[in-house]
Design a protein with these regions (language model features):
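Long, positively charged, glycine-interspersed low-complexity recognition regions
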Residues: 113-177
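GST-like fold's C-terminal all-alpha helical module
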Residues: 1-126
Length: 177
């Protein structure tokens, strides 16, 4: 389910929101001088410079939509967790990435189309180990946190991109088999 596409997509969400709006461009330019991975460098530069108009944003949306679709299908048999009745490494691995969507306030509009994934997230998020993420510095519980305000600022444009993606690829990304 969750492979390198999910890691990259989560990074794009973080860069198009928090990093783009809170880190001065000069700091990013300096940081990029030491990024050894050309794909990561180009992705970061594009997302910082172009915002939601970066082609990497659409790719990130596609990756997450594919993951959410697979999750929705897996959870459609009323199992509580991805592999069945038990919390597994699948939840431990993917939960923190969905936490980013929650932190930037994208969770509600993104998961409207995936009620089983939303219910799964609610179960995962209610676990004590996941709640502990809220106690770390730079958490996004507060509405004035960097993740929260940058997410709210970016959300309308990002939501339009998500809608655009869903309209363009509705034939490929439906919850029906």
């Amino acid at each position: 389910l969750f492979d390198e596409r999910g890691f990259e997509a989560t990074a794009v969400v973080n860069f198009v929101t928090k990093f783009r709006l809170t880190v001065p461009r000069e700091v990013m330019e300096e940081r990029w001088k030491s990024v050894p991975n050309i794909d990561r460098l180009y992705r970061q530069q594009s997302v910082i410079r172009e915002g939601v108009n970066s082609p990497y944003v659409m790719r990130a949306i596609g990756a997450m939509e594919s993951i959410f679709l697979q999750m929705e299908r897996a959870l459609s048999d009323d199992r509580p967790f991805l592999m069945g009745d038990q919390f597994t490494l699948a939840e431990a691995n993917f939960g923190p990435f969905l936490k980013i969507l929650e932190m930037v306030r994208f969770m509600d509009f993104w998961l409207d189309a995936y009620p089983n994934v939303r219910a799964w997230w609610d179960r995962v998020a209610s676990r004590e180990s996941m709640k502990q993420l809220d106690s770390f510095p730079y958490n996004a519980i507060a509405d004035d946190s960097a993740h929260a305000w940058t997410g709210r600022e970016t959300a309308p444009a990002f939501e339009r991109k998500l809608k655009e993606y869903r309209e363009a690829f509705a034939h490929a990304y439906t919850t029906q088999d």
